[in-house]
Amino acid sequence: MCESQARTNESVLSEDILYLSVRELGERIRGGKLSPVELAESFLTRSEALGPKLNAYATITRELALQQAHAAQKEIAAGHYRGPLHGLPYAAKDLVAVAGYPTTWGARPLAKQSFEYNATVIEKLNRAGAVLIGKAAMIELAGGLGYSAGDASLTGPCKNPWNTNYWTCGSSSGSGAIVAAALAPWAIGSDTRGSILCPTSWCGISGMRPSFGRVSRRGAMAIAWTMDKLGPMARTADDCGLVLSVLAGHDPLDFNSLPPGVSDFAYSPATAESAKPLRIGRLTNVWNQQVAGLESAVDAALKVLEKHGATITDVEMPDGPYEEAAELTILMESASAFDELIVSGRCAELIDPVGQINGYASQEFSVGDYLQVQRVRTFLQAQVDKLFERFDVLATAGESSAAAPLNAPPEEDSAGPIERRAPDGVSSLCGLPAISVPCGLSKEKLPFGVQFVGRALDDHAVIAAARLFQSHSDWHKMRPPIS
């Protein structure tokens, strides 16, 4: 039976089609087995039905999506195929500017904000023939001024498709829910300190934070200029590689963009394979505590890799104030990024009480304070770099737990000792690439993730590790119980 017959009574493509990977959907579009228009219509219909139940979208861009889908369909029929994302729907986190549409940054005082231009990543995707079906919901200001609970969003708390009494994590909350529930095959997320990796882990999908400077951030809201990254959240690690190959590249309008050539990311199944057996360091000291079943799930994932040629060696993250340095860098840089909002007093309109006041405290830091933190940061980066003399990638859990209940505060704001070596803080601070992919389920039937971290600029290595695991496991094929 061809895909055009695989429909529900409402003429929407079946879940078996909508849960296909980016690569599989792209191949079917290229081969004429799937129409970009019917694919867009199906994802739009599903998004309009399930998106509100999850608080997953800030805006659904139906008119734009259908316009782009029809254009893609005509081009492909005429033999003008632009590449693996041509005619393929996606969602973009609502901190990425899309001309003519609201870009609210998830924040109540900016609910009517819009821009007259597209972010560089949107321009790249337009040139690739991709189809934007919506702006994904997010935590207000991506948590840049702090927050204490998952309801700190203009659109309300984003609910986890695996259990709507649980949260998706933040700040790329909508992007995680959208991909997990097959409202789109992939989405743009942003990550300053775990905002791609946490929703990826909690939602049971694959998500990648590229090396710092690999993807242009022009037209995306800034939190911390020296730590912000944009990256793909998708069904598989292979999907992340495909999407990253389109998003990556030098942008002269982003002063932190890597130089031409260095910033490019060529990707194919051949480049995704490691030429030598992967040397993987299993981090043994990065979480204060892990929930029951998580450590064994990660160990089982690493045994799969070991069975297929990788070497696994236990290693400790060198001691140091990684989390403090990451947090202080974000606090100081966000005080500058959101200066207008703070000085005007409009931060009082934010939903979360932490965000309402945090900016004022952050502006009390001095230039000397900032420089001292950056000196410490340079030392910590050198310590972490030494680990990659022995390993290609480092591995640990995607997060220290499965998804938290909607009414629970983020773990870092709960009572207990600070996670001084949490990998999201360490690798974000050092500008390292990382990917999280699903590796199991908790006793509550919520996803666990395993995370791979690579040396700066070696984005291929983390994809290779995740791809090797996914080629010998089925956790990425799980579907949440939502329809």
What positions do the PLM features span?
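Acidic/His- and Gly-rich active-site-bordering loop/insert found
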Residues: Q67, E75-D151
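Short helix-loop capping/hinge segments that flank enzyme active sites or metal/cofactor-binding pockets
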Residues: L85-W105, Y267-T284, T329-D385, S436-P447
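An N-terminal boundary/leader segment
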Residues: M1-Q68, A77, T284, K307-G309, ...
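Residue-level signal for inorganic ion chemistry
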Residues: F43, A65, C240, I280, ...
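A short helix-breaking turn/cap at a secondary-structure junction
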Residues: S206-D299, H472-S483
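Short glycine/serine-rich loop segments
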Residues: Y117-H250, S428-Q451
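Acyltransferase
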Residues: K33-E41, H70, K124, A266-P269, ...
